[in-house]
C-alpha cells in the first residue's frame, strides 16, 4: 500500500495544506436540509432566469419584446460523494499519526468535493459584465445587473448581500487598480486589505478561475443536503487490513440565475461570425451588461457580442 510513513520513533507530524480553497461555500448559498433519496434519483427544481429585451429601434417604433423573469423546471440527479481510506495494523504501529491524518483528510476531501460542486453551479451564470479593467465600475455594473432591490440608496444593505469569488492574481490586480482610491484608508495602506467594492464583499478563492469573477447573493444557488456524513468501517482480520468509508448525499443547484453575474476581464465586441460557432459563447446586451444567448443563424447580423 502506497502510504508514506515515518520510520523514526520520535515523530514530528507536518501536514501540508489540504484545502483546495479555505472558503466554505455553504455559507454563500441557501441550504435546504430536506433532501431524501439515494444517489441517482432525480429531483426537479425551478430555476429562475431573465430574458434579454434590448432592441435597436427606428424612429416611432416600439419594443416588440420585454425583459422577463421566468422559471424553467430542470431535472437534477442526487449525488453521492464517497471516499475510502485503507491501512494495515503494522503501518499504524510504525506511524501513530497515519490514521488521524488519514481520517482528517477524508473530511477535508469531502469538503473540497462539495465545494467544487457549489462553485460549478455559480459558474453557470448567464448574466455577464465585460471589464477591461478590474475596478469599482466593474463591480458596480455587476450589482446593477442582478435582480436585487437595493442599489444606490442603500449600499450598506447590498454589502450584506453581495459577494465575489476572486482568484488571488485578480485580487492583486484589483489592489493595484484601487490603490489611488484607497490610499488614505489605513487598513489598505498597512495590509492591502480591499474588503468591499461597490457594495460587494471580496473573497479570495485560490481555485477560482483567473479572469472571471463570480458576483452573487446567497439566493442564487441552493445546496440540497442530506444531513450528516455516513461512516462505515471494515476489517480483514487475516491480513490485518482496515478500511474506512465516508459518504455524503447532496445536490447543488443554480436556482435563481438573476442573482449571479460573471465579471469577465476583457472587452465586449460585436461578433463578426456569419455562422454559429458551437465552441463560443455569444451574448446579447442586457442592462449595463450582457446575457448569454443563442443565435438563430448569423451572430453578426443578429447583433450578438463576444467577450474576451
Where are these regions (language model features)?
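Short, intrinsically disordered N-terminal pre-domain segments
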Residues: 1-23, 270-274, 278-280, 286-288, ...
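N-terminal "assembly arms/tails" that initiate or stabilize quaternary assembly
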Residues: 1-71, 238
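Long, contiguous amphipathic alpha-helices that act as assembly "spine/axial" helices in icosahedral shell
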Residues: 45, 68-127, 164, 236-248, ...
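Short helix/loop capping segments that flank catalytic or ligand/cofactor-binding pockets
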Residues: 53-56, 173-176, 253-255
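Cell-envelope/extracellular anchoring and linker segments
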Residues: 116, 120, 132-148, 159, ...
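Glycine/small-residue-rich hydrophobic helix-like segments
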Residues: 191-236
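Extended, compositionally biased alpha-helical segments that mediate assembly or anchoring
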Residues: 233-272
